[in-house]
Structure formats: C-alpha cells, structure tokens
Amino acid sequence: MTAPANVRVRFCPSPTGTPHVGMVRTALFNWAYARHTGGTFVFRIEDTDAARDSEESYLALLDALRWLGLDWDEGPEVGGPYGPYRQSQRGEIYRDVVAKLVEAGEAYYAFSTPEEVEARHIAAGRNPKLGYDNFDRHLTDSQRAAFLAEGRQPVVRLRMPDEDLGWDDLVRGSTVFAAGSVPDFALTRANGDPLYTLVNPCDDALMKITHVLRGEDLLPSTPRQLALYQALIRIGVAERIPQFAHLPTVLGEGTKKLSKRDPQSNLFAHRDRGFIPEGLLNYLALLGWAIADDRDVFSLDEMVAAFDVVDVNSNPARFDQKKADALNAEHIRMLTAADFAARLRHYLDVHGHRLALDDAAFATAAELVQTRIVVLGDAWDLLKFLNDDEYAIDPKAAAKELGPDGAAVLDAALPALDAVTDWAAPQIEAALKTALIDGLGLKPRKAFGPIRVGATGTTISPPLFESLQLLGRDRSLRRLRAARERAGQHSA
C-alpha cells in the first residue's frame, strides 16, 4: 500500500490508571507507521473526564513513552501547530464547533429524559432499552421554548444520515453499518461540556489526522464518527475523513480481553521486573504483526523499515508472558557489554541494590550475568553474594555440598588458593584444577560444588573462578575457611 505524502497519526489516551500494554501496543503501531512513512506522530491527551482523569496518570503516560523511546512530533511539552494537545484546554474550540453544527442544522438541542425515551418505546410496543428515538429532531420552536422555560437543560445531538455508513478498514476490510442502526447521539452533556463522541473526531479533523489506528473495541463508535466527519466537512471544519485501522484485541488468559486487573497488563510492572524497552517493544509488535514468518527477534529500526498497517492481522492476539520473557532475554544478550553494564547499574540503583564494586569490577560482574538472565531483576540474586551483608550459605546448598566430601575438597582447595599470588581467574582456575582434579582425581562438578557454595552461599552463581576474582583474595579465603568449619560440623 502506498501511503499519502503526509501521514499524520495520533495516540490519544485518557490519563486514568496505569499505562496498559494494549494501549502501548497501539502507541507503538502508530509511532512505527509514522516513522515508516516519514509522517507525523501526534500525542494527544483526552482528559475531558475530570472525575476520572489525574495528573499522576498524565505524568505516567509521558514517562511510559519516554522510557520506551516512542518520541512524539507534536503534543504535550513539545507543542505544535494544532495545540493545545490536552483536551481539557480546548473547551472554547469545541463550543465553537457545536454552535456551528447547530446553526447549520447538522445537530439539534434534545430535551428528552431517559425515562421519557423509555416510555415512548413502551407505548409503541418496542424494547424500552433500544436507546434514543430521535424524537427531539422534530421539535418546533415553541416546544423548545417551553422546555427551556421549564428549566430543562438540553444536550446537543448529531442528526444521523438515513443511509448505510461504511468504510474500508485497513485491517478488517469492508465494514458497513446499516442505515438506522445508530440513533442520533449526544455531542455534549446537559451542562454544555463536550463528550468523547465530539472531541475525538473534532480534534482529529482540526489536527489533520490522516490515519486512525486504534483498538478493535472502538470499532462500534466508527459509524457515529463517520457521520460527524461528514458534518464537519460540510461546515468547513474538516478537510477529509481519515482512514481507519482497527487493531486486534490483546487477550489475557483464555479468551478474555487483557484487562487492567491482569498483572501482566501493567507496563510498569514489566519495567520493575527488568524488561528493557527493546525486548518489550519487540514482543508487543508481535501482538498482531510479524516481520517475517520465520523470525521473531528484531530491532525497533527493523520494525520501522518493515511496518505497514495493512499487514496487521485482524485475529485476537494473546499476551504470552513466557514468550515476552524469552524475547527480552534475547535483547539483553544483544546489548554491548558496556551498554548492558550501564543499564544494569541504573536498574540496581533504582531498586536500592548497591554492589560495592568500582566501574571496572562492575563491568566484569555484569558480563558474567548478561547471558544468564531473562530480566534485569534476575541479576541481583546472582550477584548479591558480592555484598557481605547479603551473603549467607543456603541450608539446602550446605546439606548438598558441605558434607564429608566437601570437607576434603576444601582441605585441598584452601592451601592451593592461599599459594596463588596473582589473584585472577586464570590463576585461580589453574590452582584449583591442579589440587582437585589432578590431585584428588575428582570430576569438575564434585570438585567445584563445595567451593561455589562456600564462596557464594548457593549452588547457582556466575562462573566460579571469575566470582572468586571479584570477591578478592581475602574475602574468598575467609568465606571458604568458614565453610570448611561448617563442613566439619556436617561430617561429624
């Protein structure tokens, strides 16, 4: 598909709650399409619901996009030619558009209460829950004046066309809603405040949005929006109707939509575990799109080069935490050693984990765990033995490795290590192999298990000889001597 010369897409969340991975997937697809086409990515805040919106959630949205590296060309804190980009600051714009729609006969004042609408349906033998019946379309001036004299406050409703409303969805193909299936709908509350049904298409029109990429859950609102776009074009507010692409639902367990109550829906929970942006974005891209049939791992740049919204699959996509974890591990392994060390240092600092290592030693420690972790949070359990206040021998590990055989190993290992003058991994390895494998005739697992438990407190650690080097000579020998005493207790 060839996109128009000036693609303009938007991401327009409401600032409620914590950023959701389904919402972030929508942001990613919009961002990638803008970057692929050389277009513009607009970030707009839909904060017209004062009861639910919060400044904390607004700041969380900024934090989320910045952490992921999804930069916006227009929007909050960046500006642009069609601002302001927070709907709470655009009230006058909406009131002006509503006045023009009413003046042109595209919209009208409706005074009916929900109870009156239900009563009319019942009187006509219809289902009382059918919704609005378009009754106020036909009010006379005197009827309207009488309602106003009663003190009634009207809403403003759009006059829906008496024809089918359809569009060629870029993901789902031809989609049609039959004439009469959507009643005239409210654009404002009775107090005059604009509703989402007005502000969303109104802003898209004024901000010259060309493509609307959004979740499938919003598909039923599309015929209303098409009718509003047509009216906005007729009154000179809109230039065009954008193209629509409804992205597949993200599922959680079973066939249920991933909801805010599902822990894996929380973007920041993944960040706290130690996902890196590259890994999470790669996985989210796969929720409805693929770069190739035989390839799951790719960079953001590679996604941008390949992404076209018409290639998005319409089938629901299930969020699979294990697959997300595996992709994150791949991206961690793809980082340069220096980049990984910097990210790990920052992650540990943020989470209050301090390793008393200088930069060179930390770089060595980071390199030891880079291929052994799935998320950054896994590194702490592997490295915390380097802190004396975190070091403790696990009882199960002691029972396994610090028995009579372990005592014999440590009796041979301690003098061999004591004689090492240049405390570095190759020399440590040579001394232990000579003493334990050559001297005692042990296999490596039997030889090194007691050393690992004595030095790190556990049976699972980074490579042993490098771990001893990082611990340093004095601490290594001190821990191993204490382990030998403990092994003596086990062997008694």
Curated annotation (Swiss-Prot):
Keywords: Aminoacyl-tRNA synthetase, ATP-binding, Cytoplasm, Ligase, Nucleotide-binding, Protein biosynthesis. GO terms for cellular component: cytosol. A motif ('KMSKS' region) lies at residues 257-261. One of its GO terms (biological process) is glutamyl-tRNA aminoacylation. Its main location: cytoplasm. Disulfide bonds: none annotated. It holds the Pfam family Anticodon_2. It is found in: Cytoplasm. It catalyses: tRNA(Glu) + L-glutamate + ATP = L-glutamyl-tRNA(Glu) + AMP + diphosphate. GO terms for molecular function: ATP binding; glutamate-tRNA ligase activity; tRNA binding; zinc ion binding. ATP binds at residue 260. It is an enzyme of class 6 (ligase). It comes from the Bacteria. A motif ('HIGH' region) lies at residues 13-23. Its EC number is 6.1.1.17. PANTHER family: GLUTAMATE--TRNA LIGASE, GLUTAMATE--TRNA LIGASE, MITOCHONDRIAL-RELATED. Catalyzes the attachment of glutamate to tRNA(Glu) in a two-step reaction: glutamate is first activated by ATP to form Glu-AMP and then transferred to the acceptor end of tRNA(Glu). Belongs to the class-I aminoacyl-tRNA synthetase family. Glutamate--tRNA ligase type 1 subfamily. Monomer. This is Glutamate--tRNA ligase. It comes from Mycolicibacterium paratuberculosis (strain ATCC BAA-968 / K-10) (Mycobacterium paratuberculosis). The gene is gltX.
